[in-house]
Structures are given as structure tokens and as C-alpha cells.
């Protein structure tokens, strides 16, 4: 079995964990959590991770929740945290976990240099004195003892943006957290009162696209999907803040979708962690046929320099670029 470079660093110290109750969290990259020898392992999943298959091992427990509770970690004595690409997301997750983890627990944080993992020392300086214990292949493993619990309130981590009288609420790590994405604004400028019926928002993030549609056409029935639990929480908060209603579901693209829609809308991510990845957009295109009604529409925004004509031709007989500028373009395709 091949493990990521971050997991390989942890494996070099596997003797430490043999007689411990270990809590895994963060940007878990592979199957190490279900293979590391421990007394008991708890795995905190905050997004869909297909490589981690739930098994029948009684010593392994999965928690698929945005937030950790006292009951989840009160018997744990080690945290292994995979640092994500986003520092504010790491701070959000760690402040939640460390507000409940027992004092004197051992904390292990692993991440690549390019992700900004070194900033963990400063972010957590009041709770842990982190020290580097190993490094290899541009990754670092740090550890320390929890000396002070953090203070955590979910509402304090929401960032609020206002756009055309809409309130957009976003948690750290959610796309468009620092500011509303310009590509999202660009596709939103194509929305009109003519949009109707059932709408599927793929990769909903903060819920910006859905509330932008509802602002123009409030009778639409929106379904918002994302693989990240922080995005789902943000979308719910955005709907509530604007007094709109919608269905918010956990789904890795279409994995949890079993009905058809009049329109699928998306601002697909171009990055998978720190790497550029076009696969998500391709999957949205190729599998949209299964989830569109007759004459249904797929509408998505992308960078001006990228072309998806080749892939759209394989699925749709009719498509065009409905709007473009020197940065973005919006594709519109119809299922005949």
C-alpha cells in the first residue's frame, strides 16, 4: 500500500501510537488512519473521502460531522492532524478540536511546506508549544502537549459578505471565504427571471449561486450540494440569512443525487488541494445528462483560457458561450 508523503512521516513514528487512543482529523489523504496500529482509532471526516472505506474493525470509529463534541474526544490522548492548504480552515478545525480534547493530550500536526504548516506554531502558541520532530520530501511533522484548551464559538468563524442586498455567510475553507469569487459574480450576472423549475447547484460552497438565482426567481426550487460539511453549513446559513428555502445535501458531485432538474449550475473548482484538476468539471459535464430533464440546461463558469468544447460535444448537441470577458466565460448547454 502506497501512503502520501505526510502519512509516511507519521509511519516513521508509529511506535508512539501503538498503545494510544488516536483521533485523526484535518485533510486526511489516504488509508493510514485505518491501518495505523493503535488501541483505538477515531476518524473525523469533514468531506467525502472515497478512499476511506468503513470496515468492521470494532477499534475504528468514523465521525462524519463538521464539529467535534466533548463525547467524541474525551477518551482520546493523541490527535493526528493533517494540515490543509488553507490556514484559516486549519485554525477553525483545530480550535474546535482543542476546545474539547483533554489537557496533556499529545498533538501531532503534519503537512507539506507549501501548505503553510509552519504557521501552526504561531496559531496555536497559547495552547501548544509545537516542535518539529521530523521532515522529509518537503513535509514536516510537529508535535507538542496540549497545555491550554482553546475557546471556540462557531458564529465567530463566519465571514459575512454583502452583494446586491444578499447576505453571504462563509466558514473558513469554503470557496469564496475571503471575498465573493469574481467568477461566481460573473455567472450570477447571467441569471434572470426566466430561470424556473428545479435547480441543482453543484459545489454550492457558501450558497452564493443559489441565493442569486432565488433573488431573481424566488419560485425556483433549489437543491445545493457539496462534499465539504463546512460548505453545507455555510449554505444553510446563507439561505437563512436571506429568508430563502432550499434543500442542502452532502454529495460528491452527483453521488447522492437521484432525481432530475431543469437546470444544473456550477462554478467548478479548478484545484484539488494544491494541484490543478480539471476532472471535477469533466464529471459535471459527462454525468449531467443523467440528472437533467428534457430541454434541461447546464450552465457553468470557467476561466477564459480553458475550453470545454471537446467534452460538451460528447454530451450535448447544442451548447454555446453565453457570456465572456478577458477573465471568464459562461457555458450554456441544453439537453435535447
Swiss-Prot record:
Keywords tagged on the record: Cytoplasm, Methyltransferase, rRNA processing, S-adenosyl-L-methionine, Transferase
Location(s) in or outside the cell: Cytoplasm
A Pfam family: MTS_N
Catalytic reaction list: guanosine(1207) in 16S rRNA + S-adenosyl-L-methionine = N(2)-methylguanosine(1207) in 16S rRNA + S-adenosyl-L-homocysteine + H(+)
Gene Ontology molecular function: 16S rRNA (guanine(1207)-N(2))-methyltransferase activity
Statement: the UniProt record of this protein carries the keyword Flavoprotein: no
SUBUNIT field: Monomer.
Function (record text): Specifically methylates the guanine in position 1207 of 16S rRNA in the 30S particle.
UniProt protein name: Ribosomal RNA small subunit methyltransferase C
Annotated source species: Buchnera aphidicola subsp. Schizaphis graminum (strain Sg)
Gene name linked to the record: rsmC
